[in-house]
Amino acid sequence: MLKQENGRIIYHYDAEELWIESWGKNAVRIRATKNAEMPKDNWALLSAEEVETQIEITEDGATLRNGKVKVSISNGGKITIYNQKGKLLLEEYWRNRRDLRDSKCSAIEVEAREFRPNVGGDYHLTMRLQSLDKNEKIYGMGQYQQPYLNLKGADLELAHRNSQASVPFAISSMGYGLLWNNPGVGRVVFGNNIISYESYATKVLDYWFVVEDTPAKIEETYAKATGTVPMMPEYGLGFWQCKLRYQTQEELLEIAREYKRRNLPLDVIVVDFFHWPKQGDWKFDADYWPNPDEMIRELEAMNVKLMVSIWPTVDRESENYEEMLEKGYLIRTERGFRTGLNFEGATIHYDATNPNARKFLWEKVKTNYYDKGIKIFWLDEAEPEYSAYDFDNYRYFRGTDLEIGNIYPVEYARTFYEGMQAEGQKNIVNLLRCAWAGSQRYGALVWSGDIASSFESMRNQLAAGLNMGLAGIPWWTTDIGGFHGGDPNDPAFRELFVRWFQWGTFCPVMRLHGDREPRQPQYGTTGGAHCCSGAANEVWSYGEDVYKICVKYMNIREKMRGYTRKLMEEAHIKGTPIMRTLFYEFPEDKECWEIEDEYMYGDKYLIAPILEAGVNERRIYLPVGVQWKECNCGRIYYGGQYITLTVSLDSMPVFERI
């Protein structure tokens, strides 16, 4: 049965009800359920703006038109989507005999919208789409630790892990974007025959589909539908210093003083984890941080902001555990002991999906940090990280982990964003280790997690950062040098560090962090002092030659402050990525769709990172239609060609578009 009601097409067959409706200009939202009522959650989507929509119902089916997008559904329930030129962009993969007039009718009985019942009332949902073009390229989808920018052929887990962030918005070279608007754990396969999305426990199929002429327009329309980042504050434009971990107040202050003695630019310095007595206390340990107010005043006098690490984990011995347990503010386990992460104590995470738990945490943070003058937070463990990722074992206020777990980093960011906003703060940014669709509107700056210190890892981060931008997360960064290991006295690591530092200069936020070797002696025996501290990780820790290169690139970053501010304005207003694939800026240049190891920092600078050890040459493609100035020497090149540059350790190829 097909009908028009409340500005949408409604299709009903057996237990399934399906809605097709406009959701912004040139975009539609499609939902289906086998429950008695359609779930009302919007998840990543903001409320829809009203747009002109034409709906037509005929003997053969129904059609909805909205600007550049046309959606058709047959009487048999099959959906197809076209652009304004009549090009087929999406076709559901039905293989049955419900409609014998369908050219693809078949006896193999495969459903495009398969709701397989789970015990307890949810469904294991599979949506199948026909792969229409063997040359299609697909981008976005968040952050995965792999070198592939083009995801066609990829098999991706729709779940968060430390260094993996599922942000399920895909951009296609065919001229569309698709948001899988379901925060449940699942899987997507961008196959050459079938594109399939799965949710392992859900009540509804829900996706949003946009048609536009360029990747930039797709991204901007998506940003209107899901929100944009705030304006980046001034301290987000420069250099951030961090390591695992400064153990005392005096140690951290002495590092900041040394930066100032050397006349080096420094915007933010970081107090890392285990500055607290117990996980879940959310306060400074007075044995090692005796006067945070005085520390913050001294840093402010140096024009340096202090960022403090917050973990969502709560130790059984924390002063807040019993109250949070009694009030239902902790994530639950379906079986076994209530432990999610076994690291420096058996801990469980606060339940960010519970509004009262969000309020409780913020009040603790406000009293112990914010009211002292700390206005930027490092929200670690945001996936949340589990010692065992048994997604079927955790239950939140809003549902099971399998059903809604990917929403956690959004609600974690929201906890702080709304708390800070209520205090009158504007231009809010907080650093998180994970994101889902919509995280950007809560001031989430995502970093790529606990990654290896290797050239292979660095290559993976380049792909991850570009795909995160295309997935709608323009604020993104990495640990310069990688996280795990790396000895500042090792020549091989120094080379990696230099190459990563050069690249980090042209990332949205330039942030130095890592767990360097060898580990340092433990300072103290109580509270957070039980946690380790890595070797020195300041720019002068790597020898004089490396130091000179670091200073050069820190000053380059400073000189670009005005330009970077402009890019942040574009991200705030339109949702534009800071790091952009070549095809984002040059969609008509076919070669740009093939390049995966270069990118644009905004619209002006082409960046060609050095991604291997021992490199003395770099092959670079310069997009067609403009001229390019090599920033190191001023030489001018015509676009539309490959060039080979000789490279030395003290410089990375950068070209200015002229």
Provide a role label for each language-model segment.
Residues M1-T226, P230-G236, C242-L244, Q249-R257, ...:
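N-terminal accessory segment at the very beginning of proteins
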Residues Q4-E21, N263, E298-N303, Y417-K426, ...:
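Carbohydrate-binding surfaces of carbohydrate-active enzymes
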Residues G7, E17, D155-L158, A165-V167, ...:
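Generic recognition of flexible, low-complexity loop/linker segments
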Residues Y13, N162-S163, I171, Y200, ...:
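Active-site-proximal structural scaffolding
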Residues D14, T58-E59, R65-G67, N75, ...:
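Short, well-ordered loop/turn elements at secondary-structure boundaries
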Residues N35, E92-Y93, P265-Y547, E585-F586:
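Aromatic- and carboxylate-enriched substrate-binding clefts and catalytic-loop regions
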Residues N35, M174-Y176, P183-V185, T214, ...:
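Short, glycine-/Ser/Thr-/acidic-enriched flexible segments
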